[in-house]
């Protein structure tokens, strides 16, 4: 019964508010969907994006082996890394970069519970925005609902992984000075917080990649409900 009310509110609310873009196309879509399809399609897209991102990133080389999300040293520290490599400390630099990415890979599986929780708590307004929004509406939904609590959850895992590397302490010392001189963003002045932020960026980026696939080729997903809901938007 609750699901029925959700769907009726979603369909009628979107039609009345004119939130669709373009409105005529979205209005036609919303009126053509059978009861329950809208909510089911949106939840399926959310779940698919979350599971895909966590599965791809939360494993060995999920970050380190993917150039799109690999975590590098931040700007000004790349220059310091070059100096270290020139003095024979290249191995230490590589160890730090590897540790940063391994930390992100270890943290990402912890995201699944919160992402699933966000899907279950989706409101009627959230549903409207996702269905009639732009190409990144699923990604934006997850980021808005989970970024802060995931950051809290990721940080201890990242800290535990990076503190094993001696150069991490030097990173914080050098980065702290660089931030004090305005050469580095303050949020990047601590290796643990920097990696946590980049891990979240990578997670939402990969959710976005899956969202693009769903919107571009809903038939190719092999899901009848995704094909019906998102295929009608094309």
Across the structure, where does each feature detected by a protein language model lie?
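A cross-kingdom marker for long, charged
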Residues: 202-234
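N-terminal Sec/ER secretory leader and immediately downstream segment
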Residues: 27-99
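N-terminal secretory signal peptides and thylakoid transit peptides that target proteins
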Residues: 1-14
